């Protein structure tokens, strides 16, 4: 073990500034990277000049320190302050906040295991580093967002969890109605969730308790979301006008939230849906015949732009829940929402951003707050404890791995 790696095991107690900070700073100033991993050290000691590959794990000093901490509550206040300074120093010298170690664990996972969760200064410092890194990455990429591990943040895959998707995936050509001339092949297994054009050409199947892509079994929507949708439906209309209430849901899926919105008795209930299989289901279930329902067929990027240009329809509540879209799409949606929402209206969405890991979920919670503030809007969250964690039977990949849900409620300040 190198001197740097040994130092961050916090071998002596109490943890004091004099015992750790000068030596840490000297090591980093000497040129040892703050991202120097145990895997790199092992490769060096074996004489492997190439070192570990990009696909290998990255057990950084931050991981080692997180593993070495005592259980939450066992650090004195003074020791906690020193540990924060150690974290600050590592970040100042370029430590990455989101590497995965030899157990495929994030530093945030290790802090949570020790009991340092939301509200604790050490955990919040890691979240702050994640927010800063992601916003900087967005600037470097010229506005394009690459979330967490380099994959796009997906609203598709329902939850927006970071996924390893191909850099590109060709989809079959579509006719003028948007239908595919052929089904995506097995090579396109992740393209369905990564690219909306591919998704819209992919056959869907309604099975008990879920809507999935027929061949790949990607979860588009599942009935474990019912309690979330019940809360969301009541939330977005709580500031409704007494005489007239207009609501918009973007993405019908299984129609869970639309059923709850109908119980709120809106004057007009707009539903934007682009997938032909879902539209066919809506027609069979009689949604087209409901006098208070307006179906907007097509991508929201097209239909909502026309509504905005028309300038006659404004909403008390807007909800967004689509498949195979990314956070970059949400940023585009925000531009439309501010023009379509009433002054006292409420916007919300299915919040699975980063929900494959608790720390990533908390990072994106902050990022949404910051992004909405640029529009003069506030984002407040209600925490919903999930009574029963989702099961993923008959679904290829989970899209939500946290034991609670942050329901966003966004409105003008």
From Swiss-Prot:
UniProt-annotated binding residues for S-adenosyl-L-methionine: 199, 229, 252-257, 273-275, 300-301, 321
Domain RMT2: 192-413
SUPFAM superfamilies xref list: S-adenosyl-L-methionine-dependent methyltransferases
Molecular-function annotations in GO: protein arginine N5-methyltransferase activity
Biased composition (Low complexity): 162-182
Subcellular location: Cytoplasm; Nucleus
Enzyme Commission no: 2.1.1.-
Family: Belongs to the class I-like SAM-binding methyltransferase superfamily. RMT2 methyltransferase family.
Subunit details: Monomer.
Name the UniProt record assigns to this protein: Protein arginine N-methyltransferase 2
Organism, scientific name: Eremothecium gossypii (strain ATCC 10895 / CBS 109.51 / FGSC 9923 / NRRL Y-1056) (Yeast)
């Amino acid at each position: 073990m190198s001197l740097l790696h040994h130092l961050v095991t916090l071998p002596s107690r109490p943890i004091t500034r004099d015992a750790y900070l000068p030596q840490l700073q000297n090591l980093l100033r000497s040129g040892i990277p703050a991202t120097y991993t145990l895997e790199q050290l092992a490769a060096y000691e074996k004489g492997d000049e190439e070192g570990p590959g990009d696909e290998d794990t990255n057990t950084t000093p931050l991981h080692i320190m997180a593993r070495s901490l005592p259980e939450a509550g066992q650090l004195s206040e003074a020791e906690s302050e020193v540990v924060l300074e150690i974290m600050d120093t590592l970040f100042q010298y370029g430590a990455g906040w989101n590497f995965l170690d030899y157990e495929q664990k994030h530093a945030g996972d290790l802090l949570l295991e020790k009991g340092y969760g939301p509200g604790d200064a050490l955990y919040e410092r890691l979240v702050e580093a994640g927010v800063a890194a992601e916003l900087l990455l967005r600037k470097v990429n010229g506005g394009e967002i690459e979330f967490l591990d380099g994959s796009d943040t997906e609203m598709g895959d329902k939850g927006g969890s970071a996924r390893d998707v191909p850099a590109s995936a060709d989809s079959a050509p579509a006719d003028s109605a948007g239908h595919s001339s052929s089904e995506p092949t097995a090579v396109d297994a992740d393209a369905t969730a990564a690219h909306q054009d591919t998704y819209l050409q992919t056959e869907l199947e309604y099975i008990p308790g879920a809507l999935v892509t027929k061949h790949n079994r990607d979860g588009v929507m599942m009935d474990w979301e019912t309690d979330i949708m019940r809360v969301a439906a009541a939330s977005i209309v709580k500031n409704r006008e007494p005489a007239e209430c207009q609501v918009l849901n973007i993405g019908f899926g299984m129609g869970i939230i639309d059923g709850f919105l109908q119980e709120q008795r809106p004057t007009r209930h707009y539903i934007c849906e682009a997938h032909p299989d879902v539209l066919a289901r809506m027609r069979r279930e009689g949604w087209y015949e409901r006098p208070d329902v307006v179906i907007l067929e097509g991508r929201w990027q097209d239909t909502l732009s026309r509504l905005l240009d028309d300038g006659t329809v404004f909403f008390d509540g807007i909800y967004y829940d689509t498949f195979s879209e990314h956070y970059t799409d949400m940023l585009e949606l925000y531009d439309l929402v501010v023009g379509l929402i009433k002054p006292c209206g409420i916007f919300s969405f299915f919040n699975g951003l980063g929900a494959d890991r608790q720390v990533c979920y908390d990072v994106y919670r902050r990022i949404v707050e910051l992004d909405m503030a640029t529009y003069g809007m506030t984002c407040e969250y209600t925490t919903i404890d999930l009574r029963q964690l989702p099961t993923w039977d008959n679904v290829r990949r989970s899209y939500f791995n946290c034991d609670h849900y942050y329901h966003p409620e966004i409105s003008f300040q």
